[in-house]
Amino acid sequence: MSTPNCKITTQRLVVNDMKPLSIETEIISLTKEIITHTFIYLINHECIVRKLNEQQATFTFLVNYEMKLLHKVGSTKYNRYTEYNSKYGTFPMPIFINHAGFLECIGIKPTRNTPVIYKYDLNP
């Protein structure tokens, strides 16, 4: 009777014990990668140049976020995220301050899976 190869058994255990990242963890990670200082700057530029109201500015924010998300993860994974986000309402939503008629985006509101992120938390 031969003894089992311990090395193979250990490797199999390691592979079996590895768990994939939860979609919540992936959303948090991706949101932090997408919403950067540059991203917020571009949204604020749009707000000032086009004199957007809060509804238009929120729409612009989400369109830009989704375009960056699609570019970053590809269409298959993007569909998975948008389906999940639509079901659970986890899209990051902007926080705006109104400065005498023009909006400034200072960060994003927390959602079920995404922590609040402020402009000053982001790397310039």
From Swiss-Prot:
A Gene Ontology BP annotation from the UniProt entry: symbiont-mediated suppression of host cytoplasmic pattern recognition receptor signaling pathway via inhibition of IRF3 activity
UniProt xrefs under InterPro entries: RSV_NS2
Localization annotation: Host mitochondrion
GO cellular component, one term: host cell mitochondrion
Keywords: Host mitochondrion, Host-virus interaction, Inhibition of host innate immune response by virus, Inhibition of host interferon signaling pathway by virus, Inhibition of host IRF3 by virus, Inhibition of host IRF7 by virus, Inhibition of host RIG-I by virus, Inhibition of host RLR pathway by virus, Inhibition of host STAT2 by virus, Inhibition of host TBK1 by virus, Inhibition of host TLR pathway by virus, Interferon antiviral system evasion, Modulation of host cell apoptosis by virus, Viral immunoevasion
Main location group: host cell
Domain of life: Viruses
Motif range (DLNP): 121-124
One Pfam family linked to the record: RSV_NS2
Function: Plays a major role in antagonizing the type I IFN-mediated antiviral response. Acts cooperatively with NS1 to repress activation and nuclear translocation of host IFN-regulatory factor IRF3. Interacts with the host cytoplasmic sensor of viral nucleic acids RIGI and prevents the interaction with its downstream partner MAVS. Together with NS2, participates in the proteasomal degradation of host STAT2, IRF3, IRF7, TBK1 and RIGI through a NS-degradasome involving CUL2 and Elongin-C. The degradasome requires an intact mitochondrial MAVS. Induces host SOCS1 expression.
Family to which this protein belongs: Belongs to the pneumovirus non-structural protein 2 family.
Subunit relationships: Monomer (instable). Homomultimer. Heteromultimer with NS1. Interacts with host RIGI (via N-terminus); this interaction prevents host signaling pathway involved in interferon production. Interacts with host MAP1B/microtubule-associated protein 1B.
Domain notes per entry: The DNLP motif has IFN suppressive functions like binding to host MAP1B.
Stated name of the protein: Non-structural protein 2
Classification lineage: Viruses, Riboviria, Orthornavirae, Negarnaviricota, Haploviricotina
Name of the gene encoding the protein in the UniProt record: 1B
